[in-house]
């Protein structure tokens, strides 16, 4: 019997009343378990196997799918559950984590990062910025290491910088002419990309970012992911549609 602290990142129906639950845990990394009877509303496993739930879990099995025996909810992130926009961002965070990681490869830092991102989304901090931070932090997990601390071409650490997918990182103004595919990003956007990649989440604090800056950030991150990650996530496509609707709603309310 194994015990762990984990976050439910995916759940699927299995048979008439069971679930297959995918969790990212502090102790074991990503694992899958069968939760028997969890689809029944009165089941003792119903609450603890809800998507995004953070809890303590006890299960049998060390290889393949285990069998969940019991669980205790630590945090269910109820605000996320009740808000369609928060849900969309949190779903993407969990799907990205799921697709980027292998079974049973523990990474306590990644567990803590995911928990902090979901907690901050739940507490009402900007979900788009938090998700962008998560996307940048996930690059090394995917085996991607853009050069963000110096010019990817000449190695200079000072000057004006832009971001380039073809050069795999930032490039300084001295090298702009050497890379015609650079993104022509505003300087503050490049600074934020560097911060998101390098600094720990708890050092970044609550960042207030203008809508147009967030759009530039998303363009850069999406372009890099499309070029290098090989991931095509349904939740990301849905999230981009949600962003369009949210922007339209905000525009109507401002008018």
Curated annotation (Swiss-Prot):
HAMAP family: RecO. Involved in DNA repair and RecF pathway recombination. The lineage of its organism: Bacteria, Bacillati, Bacillota, Bacilli, Bacillales. The keyword Metal-binding does not apply. InterPro entries: ARFGAP/RecO (IPR037278), DNA_rep/recomb_RecO_N (IPR022572), NA-bd_OB-fold (IPR012340), RecO (IPR003717), RecO_C (IPR042242). Keywords: DNA damage, DNA recombination, DNA repair. Belongs to the RecO family. GO terms for biological process: DNA recombination; double-strand break repair. It comes from Listeria monocytogenes serotype 4b (strain CLIP80459). This is DNA repair protein RecO. GO terms for cellular component: bacterial nucleoid. It comes from the Bacteria.
